[in-house]
Regions:
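Conserved ABC ATPase "signature" region
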Residues: 107, 122-142
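Conserved ABC ATPase signature
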Residues: 120-121, 146-150
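Conserved catalytic motifs of ABC-family nucleotide-binding domains
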Residues: 167
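Catalytic Walker B motif of ABC-type/P-loop ATPase nucleotide-binding domains
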Residues: 171-175
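H-loop/switch region of ABC-family ATPase nucleotide-binding domains
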Residues: 206-207
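ABC ATPase nucleotide-binding domains
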Residues: 243-264
Length: 264
């Protein structure tokens, strides 16, 4: 059983390969439990590889000086992780048939499935958990709707409810605003801020600094599989640092702890 310890993730001197490419060379990072973090970087920075490391889908190269621990454990099962880390990936949307009912999309997460609940049995407690997760995301009114009739933003919030139905210790979001329009992105960022205020720990992976909610104070910048900067949002998200990260001149301004980035 995974231990109850102070760190969510401890990585030291990890080398992670994706095929023949060294995606994370000599990578070290600690994320504490109770801490919310944003991982920021351009395409190809190593964000998706880091995410797979965090969720146990990939392992680092075996070396004496390397260690990788989740919740203090070097060995774990994906089943254990699934109950302690809720993961939301944009591509999950395509796993559901258009006729799938929204509440069934959420319930099926409890069985590690994507809908198709006809032969599944759910207890009143299961249904209560699904209803609570949907209410928290503001999509309880959509419970009886077919997945194919929902907007992109509504589908994304259903996916987050799926992740939260397990009552995980941390929620991991990969590029949550992908394919969303401006209004849906705004609603989503407000939803994330509400989740953080309610005590949900969040690891947000994005390439948009403007999506980082005020409640997230630690930001880690990745480029070419290496950590370019790691620290307080107010210091890391500067015009100079982001211009270096994205290799274009950028100007950063702030509005009520939301970061705004424009061409310089």
């Amino acid at each position: 059983v995974l231990a109850h310890v102070s760190h969510l993730l401890e990585i030291a001197n990890a080398r992670v390969w994706r095929g023949k490419t060294l995606a994370l060379p000599d990578f070290s990072l600690v994320i504490s439990r109770g801490e919310s973090v944003a991982i920021l970087g351009p395409n190809g920075a190593g964000k998706s590889t880091f995410l797979k490391l965090l969720t146990g889908e990939v392992r680092p190269e075996a070396c004496p000086e390397t260690h990788c621990r989740l919740f203090g454990e070097a060995l774990w099962s994906l089943e254990e992780i699934r109950h302690r880390i809720g993961v939301v990936m944009p591509e999950e949307v395509s796993r559901f048939a258009p006729e799938e009912i929204a509440v069934d999309a959420v319930l099926s997460s409890l069985r590690g499935a994507y809908g198709r609940t006809r032969n599944m049995r759910f207890s009143p407690e299961d249904r209560s958990r699904a209803a609570a997760a949907m209410a928290l995301l503001g999509v309880d009114g959509l419970a009886a709707r077919a997945f194919g009739t929902l907007s992109s933003g509504e589908r994304r919030r259903i996916l987050i409810a799926r992740a939260l139905v397990h009552r995980p210790e941390v929620l991991v979001l990969d590029e949550p605003s992908t394919a969303l329009d401006f209004a849906a992105t705004l609603t989503l960022t407000q939803t994330l801020q509400q989740l953080l205020s309610a005590g949900t720990d969040l690891v947000l992976v994005t390439h948009h600094p403007g999506e980082i909610p005020p409640a997230i104070q630690r930001v880690i910048l990745l480029r070419d599989g290496r950590i370019l900067a790691d620290g307080l949002k107010s210091k890391v998200l500067s015009s100079a640092v982001l211009s270096d990260l994205y290799q274009v001149p950028l100007r950063v301004s702030w509005s009520q702890q939301w970061c705004q980035v424009r061409p310089a």
